[in-house]
Amino acid sequence: MSVKLTEKKTVSAMNTEQTFLIVVDGAIRRLSLGDLQKIMGNNIFYPTITLEQSSNPKFALPTPFMADMYQRAMGGYMMKVVNGKAYAAKLAPSNWEFFADGTKVDNAAKYETMVHVPDCHFKADNKTLQFGGLFPISGGKIFESPNWVGAYKISYDGNSVAHSRPNVTPKHSQTMSQFFAAAQKLGSNFGLANYGFQCLIEALYQVSFGNLNSQSVIGSGFQSSSWEACRDVPMGKCISLGDGSGKVLYNDATLGNQYPVKLFGFEDLWGKLWEFRPGIRFYMDGDTRYAVVYSGNQVSNTANGRKFTIPSSAGGEYITRKTLGAYWDAFPQAVGGGDSTYYCDGFWASTSGELLRVGGSAFAGSRCGLSSANSYDGFSLSRTVFGARLAFYGNPTIVSGSELMAM
């Protein structure tokens, strides 16, 4: 039976093991994308961006092909721990009320809603990033992010166990160490979304949208002087966006119109309440302030790692420059911009600050955003506006939705 290839649907992304049809010596043969990549060389596939060339938050963006492929390999999952072992089932990309196998999710409160974050390859120098995504780049690196990160901010159950679930309010008024301890109650491979994840998600956003103003591109997030009311709105308002990015309208009598946001499946990365990001710590040595980037599933104020100098003071001014460099460090280095220039987000720092939080609360308004960062506070501080995001540092067994529900 003949097949008309021109009548078949087109696709906008491929995995490395998937194949093209080609003609070799008059015969039809298959060639995998991975092998084609090796034949053609890296540069034809990997987009390159350069930041901070002007105050305009928009910058030249090559084809988002690699970013699209990486996003398609992400996606929402329901995860469940059974007898100490983690299992995960893919959610339908466009509707998280269903599993990918078509089974309707029975009860989201039985699971952790997580987003798969595959290893992400890149090569960077100074202010220029070459994005490999799923594909290694010769001489490049991998962002040190956990491969599974909560779609929602952490909430607690009655036993003070951390979860990533919709339809509940996020937990606050905990130290970073307390959030970590609550996550570990799920299992030793659970922890918090870290600084490596922050660097990855900012890079992916950059190569996907070509505009550093996340509030303008995606949405404002919650913004109100009634920030406690914003904080306490139950999570899951963006569930209709599935694996995607964008905003939805939320309205109540106290807050009026608000626009919770979702980026690559992650809800409210900015504008609801701050999120701790372990994996980086700060200290003073004389008059110089340093950042130390440390590895692993841990929360520490003493861990060793690579270090670089950082600003010792900032009071919420808008970021103009970040560390970037070979590790594409997302930590700010200078301020002086505005809410529509450079990174468009605010930065706070002090000589006594020891830990990082990101995103911003509803009260911070236009200073919130994906790039917003605060290194002002001590390691043991907790406040009603501080939250965290769950992460899983292991490898769950992938099952179907119906199989997960039966466990």
Where are these regions (language model features)?
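Acidic glycine-/aspartate-rich tracts in secreted/extracellular proteins
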Residues: V24-A27, C120-F122, K153-Y156, I280-R281, ...
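Short, intrinsically disordered N-terminal pre-domain segments
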Residues: M1-E17, M405-M407
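GGW-centered surface loops in extracellular recognition modules
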Residues: N42-H116, F122-A124
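Short, surface-exposed terminal/edge motifs of secreted or surface/virion proteins that either
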Residues: I22-G41
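Short hydrophobic/aromatic-rich beta-strand motifs
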Residues: E17-V24, G265-E267
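A short, polar/charged loop-to-alpha-helix boundary motif
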Residues: Y283-S295
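C-terminal, surface-exposed recognition/capping segments
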Residues: C199, S220, S225-M235, G244, ...
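Short aromatic-cysteine micro-motif
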Residues: K104-Y111, F131-L269, L273
